[in-house]
Regions:
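Active-site core segments that coordinate phosphate-bearing ligands/cofactors
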Residues: 5-7, 114-131, 137-172, 182-198, ...
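Conserved small-residue
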Residues: 17-19, 24, 76, 103, ...
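Residue-level signal for inorganic ion chemistry
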Residues: 24, 47, 76, 103, ...
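Short beta-strand-loop/turn "lid" adjacent to the catalytic site in phosphate-handling enzymes
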Residues: 64-101, 129-133, 164-185, 210-215
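Pocket-flanking alpha-helical
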Residues: 87, 108-112, 247-249
Length: 509
């Protein structure tokens, strides 16, 4: 009997291919960085064919490194970042570059809808706020600026769906991706026709993909894909789920009193609810595939991607290589330095808005002095990113329909660092748990494969076997009080500096 599961996860910055055994042990991984294209100001895109080639190459590398016979792969499942767009023809081939969820070209469309009173009404139809990186605004923009693309498109897909189409030819999506994209009435699992007619998207309505369960087997690895990946032709391919949901599932989030925090490229913060949140519409809301819950999410591009930029652009590859030579990741090395300076005073504030913040705020440091060193700077980066998460979490936990959380499941890059994980506990004042294995998106979608192949009856059962808490952190009351004071300074600085950014934007125009 085939004993391995393969999870593919194409995120905003990195694609990961991860091998798991039947009980969820992470056996090996191969990674490829995803280049981002900037064809015009505010436009962020990806070459779909290059992404597929890189993923296929990573699969070959992983199979070779792990010396795994492809016949031992029971099934392959996929995950990927949510929202954005991948438009394909009848053969599953891209008709234009993929659009990232960080794309801002639809800002004018969203502003028009807001002025006309369409945003809230149609947000209620899909149980979440409308925002620029979602397909609705992007499709309207394409209708206005690239009308030929409308005719060339057979189906509107999302990142994971494009990869799956290359694997087996299936053209569909699942409830989590369609829901997170803001195209779906998540209570009915149906595309609301009024939404498309009122927003001028009627020409796209018939191009929306059919929707199925994340745990369905939808095809088999084709002969062509087998040549590209070294997978066995005929290997079952499972539909999979969007990365936000996959990470929550792989973190073992099963109760409304748990807060899922993903500190990766984006700050992603989610809670479970017995019915959709409607009093305070969240940024994202989907039907959760475990326990009959709905997953409500607030987020921003203000998380560990700021630290990764610092490592790449300021520390440079030599520092990363030096850490590796000591058997450390750069997260471990920087966390170790931060741990050495936590007891000394540090008033530096870092605003982690390299990829955009409130009122268009850019990133920056406040309070630097000559006596500060690199460890103080990294500490400020760690703290600023946790504070940005708290901004999102404060919004998520507002309103009478909020969840009452008692603990946190932390995933993403920050979870690799014990010092950073403890900082999340101290800032948020809640116990933090980190589960085994670092690649939660790939693990969550591999769990879909495990259910599809009959290893477990459902995802609830798969979570009991394939998710294990590895580390836990308790908040320190004194540090929590000190961090709340510093967080007040952080929010004050963000609000006070807001008027400065509009003139800067105008100067760039």
């Amino acid at each position: 009997m085939a004993q391995y599961l393969l999870g593919l996860d194409a995120g905003s910055t990195m694609s990961k291919v991860v091998l798991f055994d039947r009980v969820g042990n992470e056996l090996g991984a191969a990674r490829r960085r995803n280049p981002i294209l900037f064809p015009a100001p505010g436009h962020t895109e990806r070459d779909p064919q290059a992404m597929w080639r890189d993923v296929a190459d990573a699969v070959r590398e992983l199979l070779a490194e792990q010396q795994v016979d492809a016949a031992e792969i029971a099934a392959v499942s996929v995950s990927g970042y949510g929202a954005g767009l991948y438009l394909v023809d009848r053969h599953g081939q891209a008709v234009r570059p993929g659009v990232m969820s960080t794309d801002g070209r639809a800002a004018g469309v969203l502003a028009h809808w807001e002025r006309d009173g369409l945003s809230h009404r149609n947000g209620m139809r899909t149980q979440q706020r409308l925002w620029t990186g979602q397909p609705a605004g992007l499709l309207r923009w394409l209708s206005q600026h690239e009308p030929a693309v409308v005719d060339a498109t057979h189906a509107v897909l999302f990142c994971k769906d494009y990869l799956r189409a290359q694997l087996c030819g299936d053209i569909s999506t699942d409830t989590t991706d369609a829901g997170l994209a803001g195209l779906l009435d998540v209570t009915r699992t149906a595309y609301p026709d009024e939404f498309y007619s009122e927003l001028g998207l009627a020409g796209w309505r018939d191009k929306l993909p059919r929707i199925g369960a994340s745990t369905d087997i939808v095809g088999k690895v084709s002969a062509k894909a087998a040549l590209s990946t070294n997978l066995r032709a005929g290997t079952p391919v499972v539909r999979g789920m969007v990365d936000v949901c996959a990470a929550a599932v792989a973190s073992g989030v099963t109760r409304p009193d748990q807060l899922s925090v993903i500190a990766g490229t984006f700050s992603i913060n989610s809670t479970l609810h017995t019915s959709p949140r409607l009093e305070t519409l969240p940024l994202l809301q989907i039907a959760y595939p475990v326990g009959g819950y709905y997953l409500a999410t607030e987020g921003s591009p203000s998380s560990a991607s700021n630290f990764e930029w610092y490592c790449k652009s300021i520390l440079g590859p030599d520092s990363v290589a030096a850490a590796a030579s000591r058997g450390q990741s750069i997260y471990d090395a920087c966390g170790e330095r931060v741990g050495q300076v936590l007891q000394r005073p540090n008033d530096i504030l870092f605003l982690p808005f390299l990829f955009g913040g409130p009122c268009g705020a850019p990133a920056g440091f406040l309070g630097l002095r000559a006596e500060h060193d690199g460890a103080d700077v990294v500490r400020a980066i760690f703290e600023g990113i946790v504070f940005a998460h708290k901004l999102d979490i404060d919004l998520l936990l507002s309103g009478s329909d909020r969840a009452e959380v008692r603990s946190i499941r932390l995933a993403g890059g920050a979870a690799r660092s014990p010092v950073w994980s403890q900082m999340f506990a101290d800032v948020l004042g809640l116990p933090v748990e980190v589960t085994q294995g670092g690649e939660v998106g790939a693990r969550g979608t591999a769990m879909c494969a495990a259910v599809a192949m009959g290893l477990y009856p459902d995802l609830d059962a798969a979570m009991l076997s394939m998710v294990r808490v590895e580390r836990s952190y308790q908040p320190d009351a004194a540090r929590h009080a000190a961090y709340l004071h510093k967080y007040e300074r952080f929010t004050l600085a963000t609000r006070t500096l807001a008027p400065l950014w509009q003139p800067t934007d105008e100067a760039r125009a």
